[in-house]
Swiss-Prot record:
It comes from Histophilus somni (strain 2336) (Haemophilus somnus). GO terms for cellular component: cytosol. Keywords: Cytoplasm, Ribosome biogenesis, RNA-binding, rRNA-binding. This is Dual-action ribosomal maturation protein DarP. Member of a network of 50S ribosomal subunit biogenesis factors which assembles along the 30S-50S interface, preventing incorrect 23S rRNA structures from forming. Promotes peptidyl transferase center (PTC) maturation. The keyword Cytoplasm applies. Belongs to the DarP family. The lineage of its organism: Bacteria, Pseudomonadati, Pseudomonadota, Gammaproteobacteria, Pasteurellales. GO terms for biological process: assembly of large subunit precursor of preribosome. It is found in: Cytoplasm. GO terms for molecular function: ribosome binding; rRNA binding.
């Protein structure tokens, strides 16, 4: 009869490493998040893509995905997600957040300019003097003429040409500071 060899394992001698169990669902959620990060990378312009720290293999995969369509694009995004799982995606996510935040800040500035333009056309002189106090180097005569033209265009239901010119002037005036 064969004897069973029993191994005696002393747990106290071994260093106790804490085992972290990760559920299959959590792994899938993480993979899906990385795939979405890959989609964001594919949708970036070349100049924005240059600002993100990517290794050459990942960069080539993203540039290839930008040229693909439909099913090939889907498979390439899956592949990009796989490449992202092999590296630390944190620096990539941070760089992407900076780019998106910069875009949101730019949109907010343009929205403020639109509100200022509306205020100038509706309120007239009171808003105009406030603007001149904030920006004394503004061309007073030109801006005043644009505001009057925009008010006339609004009254006569004409296309808002001066209205757009006010926005362009404010954009040049304020965003150059």
């Amino acid at each position: 009869m064969a004897k069973c060899k029993e191994e005696v394992f002393n747990w106290e001698d071994e260093e106790q490493e804490e085992i972290i169990w990760v559920s299959k669902s959590e792994i899938k959620r993480d993979a899906e998040a990385l795939k979405k990060l890959g989609e964001k990378l594919v949708n970036l312009t070349k100049t924005n893509l240059d600002k993100i720290p990517l290794d050459t293999g990942l960069r080539d995969a993203v540039e290839l995905a930008q040229r693909l369509q439909k099913e090939a694009l889907r498979r390439q995004i899956q592949y990009i997600g796989k490449l992202l799982r092999a590296i630390d995606p944190e620096p990539i996510q941070e760089a992407l957040n900076k780019i998106e935040n910069k875009h949101q800040q730019q949109q907010a500035k343009l929205h403020k300019l639109e509100l200022l333009r509306d205020e100038l056309v509706q309120k007239g002189n009171s808003a105009f003097t406030e603007l001149l106090i904030q920006y004394p180097h503004a061309d007073r005569q030109h801006l005043h003429n644009l505001i009057r033209s925009a008010q006339k265009e609004r009254e006569q239901n004409k296309p808002p040409k001066s209205y757009r010119e006010i926005f362009q002037y404010l954009k040049d005036l304020i965003l150059e500071d």
